[in-house]
């Protein structure tokens, strides 16, 4: 019998403004427990933290075990931008009034430029946070109903058909020493195909706690082992007869399920071997082949594309603002250079070295403009270049001010020397006049 024509639906709940979609799994088959009586689901969810890395939180009530996880198919953007809040101030606070005004303008220039860069970086961080918030709104809550060992053998027909409806994935389990549960698997598959809905997936899990996972590539050893022992391979004509000491050949079982295109896993509830792989395999099958989950994935990708387009538009606007700021900064820079030239002229400082510095600064401004044009496609790089340009301008200002201060100190020193010489000459003349007057008095 084929599966029902009804399509699978996904129930949606709202929790803290997040859309949570319910993914339902049903576990059926024989009794699969560890030596301590712990079921495979409990072992997977509760007793090994290494096996629940993909899950946020979970709770268990009676036969239901629920846990939440983020739908990891949605890509997320996590970009951290380094923000340079450092502002370089001039140390020449003891200069004349003109020099202090020059420092004040220079500090305002740096403050404005750094504030603009910080605003642009904050805009980028806000856009990235919006992307992460949009992605986190899509979550999947997985609901597992464990009916293994509740309905087996003659009671298999007593399971109501409503148990199969709305189930996205089925886990058929059996123990390697329980040939009855193994031989009932064809009935379970037939039941699932009869009552389940489209796009539902099946995996078969065998619990083998006595030995390690066999090598399925060794086909020769499997035929010899099956002939030398009372192992019953699975087929639809096998009768459910209890045979003492009979087990299941996992290699033959694996070949059979491969022919049915059903994934088959050998796990160990005692050692946790392959348990995580089995659950994740079923989750992947459902996500990759179910058009409903593909729709949510595409919807999430569209949201990310829209957010990226908005980020690009914001980056372009930020680049335009940066260009305007750079133009204003260049004008302020030229005005500051003119103030420095006037100050040097008033103090009779040689203008040749200062003019050379101005030419170098003009070249730096041209390079800054080229860098700004090249960095329009990347706002973060543009902000970093602006900070570097500010540092270069500050260094140039400081060098010019140091030169000016040194020249003023030299002039002041020379002036003091000249004053001392003049005072000494006046003192010498007075001494000579006193000596002359003394000589005249003696002669009289």
Swiss-Prot record:
Subcellular location(s) per record: Cell membrane
Keyword Cell membrane among UniProt keywords: yes
Keywords, comma-separated and alphabetical: Cell membrane, GTP-binding, Lipoprotein, Membrane, Methylation, Nucleotide-binding, Palmitate, Prenylation
Motif Effector region in this chain: 51-58
Propeptide, residue positions: 442-444
Modification type Cysteine methyl ester: residues: 441
Any GO CC annotation of this UniProt entry: membrane
Pfam entry (one): Ras
Binding locations of GTP: 29-36, 73-77, 207-210
Keyword Nucleotide-binding in record: yes
Lipidation (S-geranylgeranyl cysteine): 441
Membrane topology field: Lipid-anchor
Name the UniProt record assigns to this protein: Ras-related protein RabX
């Amino acid at each position: 019998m084929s599966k029902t024509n009804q399509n699978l639906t996904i129930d949606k709940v709202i929790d803290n403004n997040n859309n949570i979609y319910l993914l339902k799994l049903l576990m059926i088959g024989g009794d699969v427990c560890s030596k301590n009586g712990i079921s495979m689901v409990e072992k997977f969810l509760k007793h090994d933290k290494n096996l629940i890395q993909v899950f946020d939180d979970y709770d268990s009530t009676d036969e239901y075990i629920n846990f939440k996880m983020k739908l990891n198919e949605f890509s997320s953007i996590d970009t951290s931008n380094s923000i340079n809040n450092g502002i370089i101030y001039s140390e020449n606070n003891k200069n004349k009034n003109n020099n202090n005004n020059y420092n004040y303008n220079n500090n305002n220039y740096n403050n404005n430029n750094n504030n603009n860069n910080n605003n642009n970086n904050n805009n980028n961080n806000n856009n990235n946070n919006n992307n992460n918030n949009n992605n986190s709104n899509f979550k999947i809550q997985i609901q597992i109903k464990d009916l293994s060992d509740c309905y087996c053998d003659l009671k298999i027909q007593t399971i109501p058909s409503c148990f199969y409806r709305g189930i996205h994935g089925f886990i058929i389990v059996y123990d390697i020493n329980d040939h009855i549960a193994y031989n009932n698997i064809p009935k379970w598959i037939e039941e699932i195909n009869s009552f389940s809905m489209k796009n539902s997936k099946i995996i078969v899990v065998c619990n083998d706690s006595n030995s390690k996972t066999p090598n399925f590539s060794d086909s020769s050893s499997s035929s010899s082992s099956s002939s030398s022992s009372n192992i019953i391979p699975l087929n639809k004509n096998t009768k459910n007869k209890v045979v003492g000491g009979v087990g299941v050949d996992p290699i033959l079982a694996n070949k059979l399920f491969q022919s049915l295109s059903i994934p088959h896993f050998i796990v160990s509830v005692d050692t946790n071997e392959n348990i995580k792989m089995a659950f994740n395999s079923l989750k992947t099958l459902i996500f990759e082949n179910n058009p409903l989950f593909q729709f949510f994935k595409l919807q999430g990708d569209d949201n990310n594309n829209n957010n990226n387009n908005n980020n690009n538009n914001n980056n372009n606007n930020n680049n335009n603002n940066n260009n305007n700021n750079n133009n204003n900064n260049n004008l302020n820079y030229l005005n500051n250079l003119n103030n420095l030239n006037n100050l040097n002229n008033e103090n009779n400082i040689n203008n040749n070295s200062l003019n050379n510095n101005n030419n170098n600064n003009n070249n730096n401004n041209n390079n800054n403009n080229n860098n700004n044009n090249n960095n329009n496609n990347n706002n973060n790089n543009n902000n970093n270049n602006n900070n570097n340009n500010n540092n270069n301008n500050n260094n140039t200002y400081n060098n010019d001010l140091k030169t000016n201060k040194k020249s003023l100190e030299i002039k002041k020193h020379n002036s003091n020397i000249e004053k001392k010489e003049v005072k000494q000459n006046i003192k010498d003349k007075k001494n000579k006049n006193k000596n002359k007057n003394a000589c005249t008095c003696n002669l009289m």
